[in-house]
Structure formats: C-alpha cells, structure tokens
C-alpha cells in the first residue's frame, strides 16, 4: 500500500467516525436547520468540484470539513459569524481544486 492509499484509508476511516458522531448527535439535538445547512454546504462542494479534476480524496476531505462545520455552527447556536467563518474555512480549499 503506497502513501496515497494509506492517507486515503486513514481519511475514509476518520470520515466514517466523524459522520457516525454527527448522526448520533443529530438524533438527539441537531434540528432541521442543521440538516438544511448541511445540504447547502454539500451543494456548494458539489458545484465547485463537479467539473474539476478533484480526486475522491479531495471531495472526501471537503465533506469531512462540511460535517465539522455543521457541528461547529450548531455548537455556536447558529450564530451568523460562526456560519460565515465555517463557509470561509471550507471555501479556500474549494478554490484550490479549480
């Protein structure tokens, strides 16, 4: 297994763990607006990467960041500044993929 494959496997496992945590929290405390926010971020990622030569690994990293951004925004009670900060956090990576 080469370095890229090891990195991809590690990130896939990390993503599974983050998603499991997110979905467990979702059952207990995350409401519809968080689900809507996740759909918006997901759409943003898809639009920015659909015509680019982004590897699966790059998309996976963005989706992991998206999940963490949703958790961050929820923990800050959907504060507008927290939302803007999270989107800016994701956006630089999206621009690199173009």
Swiss-Prot record:
This protein's record includes keyword Aminoacyl-tRNA synthetase: no
Superkingdom: Viruses
The UniProt record lists the keyword Hydrolase: no
Subcellular location per the Swiss-Prot or TrEMBL entry: Host cytoplasm; Host mitochondrion
Annotated Pfam families: Rota_NS6 (PF04866)
Predominant subcellular localization, coarse grouping: host cell
Cellular-component GO terms for this entry: host cell mitochondrion
Keywords, ordered alphabetically: Host cytoplasm, Host mitochondrion
HAMAP family assigned to the protein according to its UniProt record, in alphabetical order: ROTA_NSP6 (MF_04093)
Protein family membership: Belongs to the rotavirus A NSP6 family.
SUBUNIT field: Interacts with NSP2 and NSP5.
Protein name per its UniProtKB record: Non-structural protein 6
Organism: Rotavirus A (isolate RVA/Human/United Kingdom/A64/1987/G10P11[14])
């Amino acid at each position: 297994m080469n370095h890229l494959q090891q990195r991809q496997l590690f990130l896939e496992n990390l993503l599974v763990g983050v998603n499991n945590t997110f979905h467990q929290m979702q059952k207990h405390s995350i409401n519809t607006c968080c689900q809507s926010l996740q759909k918006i971020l997901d759409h943003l990622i898809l639009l920015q990467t659909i015509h680019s030569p982004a590897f699966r690994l790059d998309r996976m990293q963005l989706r992991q960041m998206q999940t963490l951004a949703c958790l961050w925004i929820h923990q800050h009670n959907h504060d507008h500044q927290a939302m803007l900060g999270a989107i800016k956090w994701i956006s630089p990576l999206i621009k690199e993929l173009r």
